[in-house]
Regions:
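Beta-propeller blade signature
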Residues: 34-44
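Short loop/turn segments that connect beta-strands within beta-propeller blades
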Residues: 43-45, 88-90, 131-132
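Blade-level signature of beta-propeller repeat domains, shared across WD40, Kelch, NHL, RCC1
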Residues: 104-132
Length: 132
Protein backbone atom coordinates (compact mmCIF):
# COMPACT_ATOMS: atom_id res chain seq x y z
CA UNK A 1 0.00 0.00 0.00
CA UNK A 2 1.10 3.54 -0.66
CA UNK A 3 -0.05 6.69 1.10
CA UNK A 4 0.46 9.95 -0.77
CA UNK A 5 -0.21 13.57 0.22
CA UNK A 6 -2.70 12.69 2.94
CA UNK A 7 -5.02 10.82 0.59
CA UNK A 8 -5.08 7.42 2.21
CA UNK A 9 -7.72 5.05 0.91
CA UNK A 10 -7.19 1.48 -0.24
CA UNK A 11 -9.47 0.13 -2.96
CA UNK A 12 -10.56 -3.50 -2.89
CA UNK A 13 -13.10 -5.43 -4.87
CA UNK A 14 -15.41 -7.60 -2.81
CA UNK A 15 -15.19 -11.32 -3.47
CA UNK A 16 -17.90 -13.94 -3.24
CA UNK A 17 -17.32 -16.53 -0.47
CA UNK A 18 -18.52 -19.30 -2.79
CA UNK A 19 -15.37 -19.06 -4.89
CA UNK A 20 -14.78 -18.16 -8.50
CA UNK A 21 -17.26 -18.54 -11.33
CA UNK A 22 -15.38 -21.42 -12.93
CA UNK A 23 -12.29 -19.50 -14.07
CA UNK A 24 -10.05 -21.08 -11.44
CA UNK A 25 -10.44 -22.77 -8.10
CA UNK A 26 -13.84 -23.88 -6.89
CA UNK A 27 -16.52 -23.92 -9.60
CA UNK A 28 -19.99 -22.69 -8.73
CA UNK A 29 -23.12 -23.27 -10.80
CA UNK A 30 -24.46 -20.58 -13.12
CA UNK A 31 -27.63 -19.80 -11.21
CA UNK A 32 -28.16 -17.45 -8.29
CA UNK A 33 -26.77 -14.08 -7.44
CA UNK A 34 -23.16 -12.93 -7.61
CA UNK A 35 -23.06 -9.90 -5.35
CA UNK A 36 -20.31 -7.41 -5.90
CA UNK A 37 -19.13 -4.09 -4.58
CA UNK A 38 -16.26 -1.68 -4.93
CA UNK A 39 -15.13 -0.59 -1.46
CA UNK A 40 -12.72 2.00 -0.11
CA UNK A 41 -11.17 1.53 3.31
CA UNK A 42 -9.46 4.30 5.27
CA UNK A 43 -6.03 2.85 6.05
CA UNK A 44 -5.59 5.02 9.15
CA UNK A 45 -8.78 3.83 10.85
CA UNK A 46 -9.29 0.49 9.02
CA UNK A 47 -12.95 1.49 8.69
CA UNK A 48 -14.98 1.51 5.47
CA UNK A 49 -14.93 4.91 3.77
CA UNK A 50 -17.54 4.12 1.09
CA UNK A 51 -19.06 1.28 -0.90
CA UNK A 52 -20.43 1.14 -4.45
CA UNK A 53 -22.82 -1.74 -5.13
CA UNK A 54 -22.51 -3.04 -8.69
CA UNK A 55 -25.80 -3.03 -10.59
CA UNK A 56 -26.50 -5.52 -13.34
CA UNK A 57 -27.40 -9.09 -14.05
CA UNK A 58 -26.89 -11.45 -11.09
CA UNK A 59 -25.61 -8.63 -8.90
CA UNK A 60 -23.14 -7.30 -11.45
CA UNK A 61 -19.58 -7.03 -10.26
CA UNK A 62 -16.41 -5.42 -11.47
CA UNK A 63 -14.26 -6.66 -14.29
CA UNK A 64 -10.65 -6.02 -15.13
CA UNK A 65 -8.43 -4.20 -12.69
CA UNK A 66 -8.81 -0.83 -10.99
CA UNK A 67 -6.75 2.24 -11.85
CA UNK A 68 -6.40 4.95 -9.18
CA UNK A 69 -5.07 8.34 -10.32
CA UNK A 70 -3.42 11.16 -8.39
CA UNK A 71 -6.43 13.27 -9.40
CA UNK A 72 -8.61 11.16 -7.07
CA UNK A 73 -10.32 9.20 -9.85
CA UNK A 74 -10.85 5.45 -10.09
CA UNK A 75 -11.38 3.62 -13.39
CA UNK A 76 -12.66 0.07 -13.80
CA UNK A 77 -15.16 -2.00 -15.76
CA UNK A 78 -18.52 -3.41 -14.71
CA UNK A 79 -20.22 -6.67 -15.65
CA UNK A 80 -22.49 -4.87 -18.13
CA UNK A 81 -19.56 -3.86 -20.36
CA UNK A 82 -19.22 -0.29 -19.10
CA UNK A 83 -15.92 1.45 -18.44
CA UNK A 84 -16.64 3.56 -15.34
CA UNK A 85 -14.94 6.54 -13.69
CA UNK A 86 -15.54 7.08 -9.96
CA UNK A 87 -14.79 9.90 -7.56
CA UNK A 88 -12.24 8.23 -5.26
CA UNK A 89 -13.23 10.40 -2.30
CA UNK A 90 -16.86 9.25 -2.11
CA UNK A 91 -17.38 6.40 -4.61
CA UNK A 92 -19.85 8.29 -6.78
CA UNK A 93 -19.82 7.25 -10.45
CA UNK A 94 -18.86 10.26 -12.58
CA UNK A 95 -18.92 8.89 -16.12
CA UNK A 96 -19.22 5.66 -18.09
CA UNK A 97 -18.89 4.39 -21.64
CA UNK A 98 -20.21 1.05 -22.87
CA UNK A 99 -17.19 -0.44 -24.62
CA UNK A 100 -17.59 -4.16 -23.89
CA UNK A 101 -16.19 -6.60 -21.38
CA UNK A 102 -12.93 -5.48 -19.81
CA UNK A 103 -10.51 -8.20 -18.81
CA UNK A 104 -7.41 -6.07 -18.25
CA UNK A 105 -6.61 -3.19 -15.95
CA UNK A 106 -6.66 0.29 -17.47
CA UNK A 107 -3.44 2.32 -17.73
CA UNK A 108 -2.72 6.03 -17.69
CA UNK A 109 -0.17 8.23 -19.43
CA UNK A 110 0.34 11.90 -20.27
CA UNK A 111 1.29 13.66 -23.50
CA UNK A 112 2.10 17.37 -23.46
CA UNK A 113 0.57 17.72 -19.99
CA UNK A 114 -2.75 16.05 -20.91
CA UNK A 115 -3.62 12.84 -19.06
CA UNK A 116 -5.17 9.88 -20.88
CA UNK A 117 -6.63 6.58 -19.70
CA UNK A 118 -6.02 3.59 -21.95
CA UNK A 119 -7.97 0.33 -21.81
CA UNK A 120 -8.03 -2.76 -24.03
CA UNK A 121 -11.19 -4.70 -24.87
CA UNK A 122 -10.68 -7.69 -27.12
CA UNK A 123 -8.55 -6.49 -30.04
CA UNK A 124 -9.53 -2.82 -29.58
CA UNK A 125 -7.57 -0.22 -27.63
CA UNK A 126 -9.53 2.77 -26.27
CA UNK A 127 -7.93 6.04 -25.13
CA UNK A 128 -9.92 8.60 -23.13
CA UNK A 129 -8.61 12.13 -22.46
CA UNK A 130 -9.23 13.49 -18.98
CA UNK A 131 -10.60 17.00 -18.52
CA UNK A 132 -8.21 19.84 -17.87
Amino acid sequence: MHEHNGFNLVYLTETDPRGSMGLAGKTVGGSGSWPGALRAIDVKTAKPAWRHEWPGVNGGGGSGGILATAGKLLFTGDASGNFVAFDATNGNPLWHSRIGGLTNAPETFAIDGRQYVLVAVGDTLYAFALGQ
